Amino acid sequence: MSRKGLNIYKRKDGRWEARYIKSRTAQGKPLYGYLYASSYHEARNRLQDVIRLQGNAPNSKEMCKGSVFEFFSIEWLDTFSTNFKESTYIRYRTLIRCYLMPYFQTAKIESITKEHVLDFCKEIETHGKRDGTALSTKTVSDILSVLRRILHYAKAQNIPVDSAIFDIRIKQTPKPLPVLSLSEQLTLQKYLIGHPDCLNLGILLCLFTGIRIGELCALTWDKISLSERNLCICQTMQRIQTRIPESQKTHILISSPKSSSANRAIPVSHMLFEYLNMYPLGKTGYFLSGSSSRLIEPRCVQRRFHKILMACGLENRNFHVLRHTFATRCVEARIDIKTLSEILGHSSVTITMNRYVHPSLELKRETMEQLADFISVK
């Protein structure tokens, strides 16, 4: 893990490694140099000596109103890295490297204006992906949020910043999320029950509880109480990039859920309880594998889900449709929204209503008929 402020890491062999930009390719890609020392302070001193020779000393910020965006973006990320979950750190680093750096890398902090940022947002909104297609408004909003954080950090270092940038907001237009119809859900349920194995039981569990795919993969049998008929969600699994910037390697990360409200206990219905109790597993280790040494990661579950949809003759959808479907069925069954919000692990009822609840046309028609009956003249 790096110490605050500089790109200095402690290696597994006990040495400290300092990284700096030595030069750049013709395309502007940075080429890094590395320094090694037996202590953090020695590595820091050697790194600062090299940077001073490059005319880019980080301890001269008070004299350097023209400090470039790249410097502050790297320093902000390193300074606050210990405050972020590992997955959050990797997410921020990716947004900086893939979107902010190509546009603002050599720009002077004080020269970045509201107009520049608006032009940047418009550009990535229309063709920000690698294939030249548009980014989602959610991703653009996330990128803008990181940019604001970096500029706030620069402002705290007495660098002039256009305050109008902080007022920019991206209007998000959420798309209707796909939900399985009742007939599609019954078709899927019939297949899962008729082909019992660990993965199919896991998919059925998501359909009946609304847990996320990462939460399913990290679920262990000791978090399921068949006697009390509930399951405890307290961790999630995902595959993320390593912290080494130049590496393309990834690793599995099992960590706490995305928020404190996502730590929750979910009651198990009598129908799901019967399936869990009948399944011939040793009921130890990970729920999906029955082993503490072998795990099944989200992309494997996603692939299985796609194959099942194909076998059922259903339209191909993302695994998250199970969560949306669960929430929608709960609303149709008139389950209390506050209760549903806690089962889903949301921090507020508003999130549940706006993001995951999609009343069907049939429910809307029934509501209108109820209104007509109420106001009709007898």
Regions found by a protein language model. Name each.
Residues 172, 179, 237-239, 273, ...:
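Catalytic-site neighborhood detector that most strongly recognizes the C-terminal catalytic loop/helix
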Residues 156, 204, 208-215, 307, ...:
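C-terminal catalytic core of tyrosine-transesterase DNA break-rejoin enzymes
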Residues 134-137, 141-143, 156, 160-162, ...:
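Basic, Lys/Arg- and aromatic-enriched nucleic-acid-binding interface segment
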Residues 183, 246, 267-315:
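Active-site/catalytic core of tyrosine-dependent DNA strand-transfer enzymes
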Residues 228, 239-263, 270-272, 292, ...:
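C-terminal secondary-structure termini that scaffold catalytic or DNA-interacting sites
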Residues 187-191, 243-247, 333, 354, ...:
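DNA/chromatin major-groove-contacting recognition/catalytic segments
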Residues 77-159, 174, 294-300, 315-318:
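N-terminal core-binding DNA-recognition domain of tyrosine site-specific recombinases/integrases
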Residues 11-17, 22-118, 281:
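N-terminal DNA-binding module of tyrosine recombinases/phage integrases
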